[in-house]
């Protein structure tokens, strides 16, 4: 009389495991596409000295805060010392866009930190066409970050870069804090990078 119950429990356990594996398999994360531009003549100025991190146009919204914090951590890792604007030798301007990527590759805004192009190299950062790298399934949430580093005194652009990736909406990396660290870490990997080069950084 006890065997059918045991068999039912085993069947339920197998079904539960299968459903869990299915949920894991449906989580998709693309590589981070990174493009960077720099003035070779000023390469020596990068990765040292004091820097102030801000949103484009002084934007200081709560939505932008985790991205600014992630950028500040990466800048410290590559050699900068974060300081107040008045004492900074360089300024890092951060722009972030979050979007939903449909199966046809079209973007629908989720939320926007600061819009528009941020640099002066004619790169039009943030205006690229999104490509859905995942298979079938639900929508994907994309995060795009652009950062420009300028001389504080002259406003001259020393470096600019963009990082963009997508994750299925059920992935932990679709959350704001996790996506902030993901794009920032990729953007500043092997900093400052090569002028005009686009690379893909795998997400661990």
Predicted regions and their residues:
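C-terminal/domain-edge helix-coil "capping" segments
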Residues: 25-43, 136-204
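Structured segments of extracytoplasmic/periplasmic soluble domains
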Residues: 70-81, 99, 186-194
């Amino acid at each position: 009389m006890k065997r059918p119950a045991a068999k039912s429990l085993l069947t339920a356990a197998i079904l539960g495991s299968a459903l869990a594996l299915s949920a894991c398999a449906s989580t998709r994360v693309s590589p981070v596409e990174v493009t960077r531009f720099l003035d070779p003549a000023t390469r020596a100025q990068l990765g040292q000295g004091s820097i102030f991190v801000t949103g484009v146009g002084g934007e200081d919204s709560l939505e932008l805060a985790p991205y600014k914090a992630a950028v500040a951590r990466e800048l410290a890792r590559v050699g900068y010392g974060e300081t107040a604007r008045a004492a900074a030798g360089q300024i890092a301007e951060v722009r972030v866009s979050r979007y939903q990527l449909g199966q046809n590759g079209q973007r629908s805004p989720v939320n926007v930190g600061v819009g528009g192009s941020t640099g002066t190299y004619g790169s039009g950062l943030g205006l690229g066409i999104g490509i859905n790298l995942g298979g079938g399934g639900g929508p994907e949430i994309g995060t795009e970050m652009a950062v420009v580093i300028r001389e504080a005194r002259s406003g001259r652009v020393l470096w600019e870069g963009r990082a963009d990736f997508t994750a299925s909406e059920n992935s932990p990396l679709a959350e704001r804090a996790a996506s902030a660290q993901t794009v920032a870490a990729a953007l500043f990997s092997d900093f400052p990078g090569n002028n005009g080069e686009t690379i893909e950084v795998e997400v661990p």
